[in-house]
Amino acid sequence: MIRVLLVDDSPVTLMVLQSILEKEPDISVIGQAKNGKEAIILASRLAPDIITMDINMPDLDGFATTRQIMERTPVPIIIVSGIDNLEEIRASFRAVEAGALAVFRKPPAYGDPDYEEAVSEFVNAIRTYSEVKVIRRRSNHLKVPKPEASTIQIPFQIHQDIRVIVIGASTGGPQVIQEIISNLPLGFPLPLVLVQHMSPGFIEGLALWLTESTGFPVSIAREGEVLQPGKLYVAPDGIHTGVTSDLRFSFSISPPEHNLRPSVSYLFRSAAKNLGSHVLGILLSGMGSDGAEELLQIRQNGGCTIIQDRDSSFVYGMPGAAEMLNAGMFSLPPVEIARFLRSLSERRQL
């Protein structure tokens, strides 16, 4: 039985979330907190398997509450937020930085066209994220210092030939992406393209949070746009995003892959097909196997491939599936991925 603590200052929202979850035979709501202070007490007293966290609450907001819980009694936390308020979305990603695993939209009212999809997404998130092993966050948590050059030997042909870096991520991805790009130099000589599995409505907030927290330029990809070096592009909601041979974005509304659109598989496959050996593919932490076979295609077509290592992954599903296929040339933690990219940048300039 999955034991859930609900945190929200709205009695109506608490009632709605409880009514959704109590229909599930494997889920039990063991408590409700109306503010952050109650949440901290109940998290310690009840030891839930997972907490759903609101952001805008009196006295102690969701960001501060998440931070204190992760410092004292670490437990999987998902942020359940509205998607109509950009400031609330931005605050949601600050909570991710403090240790929350993911951000999801609050289910709309019954009868709304998106109700069934949102409810299914919420319930699946409870089941999925309750299994993630989390660690205690230090109160004096600091950003990782700028990494030195990687000790990994990068073949000369690789650092001369790469034209684009494509990245796929799911569970734990935002934190890892933040760590990687915060350690890239200004004027990084290559474009980066990211597919991040995320609840609809939060991609713009993700891009804003990454830009503000790292100083690295991040934007939402646009169809036909020419990729520029030194910039991270994030695939938009609901659209498969690919790259062409002349480094432009191509979009598609073809059926979802792995029940996902955009999918990592679509991005990686387009890069392997259109750019061959000129691609660096990186597959980060996440559930399932999205992108694993296509990472192998990048490697088979002469590109360079990296998977996040098991120890640093929140969930080793996607990189683990790639490892089983021998798709990754390198298996690295985030700090080493950043070092690899810095070395790639520095050696290209020699």
UniProtKB/Swiss-Prot annotation:
The lineage of its organism: Archaea, Methanobacteriati, Methanobacteriota, Stenosarchaea group, Methanomicrobia. Involved in chemotaxis. Part of a chemotaxis signal transduction system that modulates chemotaxis in response to various stimuli. Catalyzes the demethylation of specific methylglutamate residues introduced into the chemoreceptors (methyl-accepting chemotaxis proteins or MCP) by CheR. Also mediates the irreversible deamidation of specific glutamine residues to glutamic acid. It comes from Methanospirillum hungatei JF-1 (strain ATCC 27890 / DSM 864 / NBRC 100397 / JF-1). Phosphorylated by CheA. Phosphorylation of the N-terminal regulatory domain activates the methylesterase activity. Contains a C-terminal catalytic domain, and an N-terminal region which modulates catalytic activity. GO terms for cellular component: cytoplasm. Pfam families: CheB_methylest, Response_reg. Its main location: cytoplasm. Keywords: Chemotaxis, Cytoplasm, Hydrolase, Phosphoprotein. Residues 3-121 form the Response regulatory domain. The modification 4-aspartylphosphate is found at D54. Residues 158-322 form the CheB-type methylesterase domain. The active site is at S170, H197, D290. One of its GO terms (molecular function) is protein-glutamate methylesterase activity. GO terms for biological process: chemotaxis. Transmembrane segments: none annotated. Its EC number is 3.1.1.61, 3.5.1.44. It is found in: Cytoplasm. This is Protein-glutamate methylesterase/protein-glutamine glutaminase 2. InterPro entries: CheB-like, CheB_C, CheY-like_superfamily, Sig_transdc_resp-reg_Me-estase, Sig_transdc_resp-reg_receiver. It catalyses: [protein]-L-glutamate 5-O-methyl ester + H2O = L-glutamyl-[protein] + methanol + H(+); L-glutaminyl-[protein] + H2O = L-glutamyl-[protein] + NH4(+). Belongs to the CheB family.
